[in-house]
């Protein structure tokens, strides 16, 4: 006590093999307007400096969520520890709009979803490429909720990613506002209802910008999601699929906005792992 030393007091699962974890470090970079952005960079297990590896960009929910330094081996929709053990690097940025960086930063995405936040994120991707870690020809993007929104938005704005995983995403800001259990959420962010500024709502909706998307896309959505109704997932899935772009939709029976059944969470984790291995590591 008082020395900040770590002391092992028990080891309940000593008989189980210990899975290796990738090194995680805090990364900082400048966005296009000079704003400093912070995030977490996870290296593949056994990473050799100077080697370029597949990069996965994970975008958090919220938008007021935040990535924190914490144990990487917990279960979640995206199996980050497994990704690292399979040779992927992982970037988890905290773009403008994230919590924990002050009020001005928290509200810097007002009326600007898909604007400054997108540029913050892409500047982080460029930084990892500049570091000689990410292979620019083998990059994937993924996220749940607002992270799913940003994932679907990202692939309407750039063709740099070879695969995307869109989870429980808001993809049509107009129809979302009329069907979600939080009808006032987007009006608070956009300064009015869709009928007050239909042009802005449409301009920032991935569905309205989906023409020309070529990124293979996995859409995942809970059938019982009332926060972001499953129709949002179907809208984007159909927009991508009808253009001839590879697309799959995983419907999760009984699941709300955040999946709660262990077997469903396991299904999501395995599906995401398989999806990115298929598209970023062909032949593996």
Label the predicted regions.
Residues 1-284:
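Serine-hydrolase catalytic core recognition
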């Amino acid at each position: 006590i008082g020395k900040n030393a770590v002391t092992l007091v028990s080891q309940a699962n000593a008989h189980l093999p210990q899975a290796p974890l990738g090194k995680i470090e805090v990364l900082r970079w400048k966005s296009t307007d000079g704003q400093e952005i912070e995030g977490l960079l996870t290296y593949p297990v056994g990473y050799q400096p100077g080697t370029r590896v597949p990069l996965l960009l994970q975008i958090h929910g919220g938008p007021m969520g935040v990535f924190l330094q914490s144990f990487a081996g917990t279960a979640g929709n995206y199996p980050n520890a497994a990704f690292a053990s399979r040779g992927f690097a992982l970037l988890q940025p905290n773009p403008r709009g994230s919590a924990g960086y002050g009020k001005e930063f928290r509200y810097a995405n007002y009326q600007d979803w898909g604007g400054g936040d997108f540029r913050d994120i892409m500047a982080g991707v460029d930084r990892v490429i500049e570091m000689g870690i990410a292979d620019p020809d083998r990059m994937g993007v993924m996220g749940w909720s607002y992270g799913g929104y940003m994932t679907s938005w990202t692939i309407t704005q750039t063709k740099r990613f070879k695969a995307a995983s869109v989870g429980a995403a808001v993809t049509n800001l107009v129809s979302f506002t009329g069907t979600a259990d939080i009808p006032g959420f987007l009006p608070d962010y956009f300064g009015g209802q869709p009928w007050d500024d239909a042009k802005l709502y449409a301009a920032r909706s991935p569905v309205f910008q989906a023409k020309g998307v070529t990124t293979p896309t996995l859409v995942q959505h809970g059938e019982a999601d009332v926060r972001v109704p499953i129709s949002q997932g179907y809208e984007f899935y159909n927009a991508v699929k009808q253009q001839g772009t590879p697309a799959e939709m995983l419907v999760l029976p009984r699941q709300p906005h955040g999946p709660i059944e262990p077997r469903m969470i396991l299904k999501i984790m395995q599906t995401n792992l398989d999806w990115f291995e298929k598209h970023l590591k062909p032949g593996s």
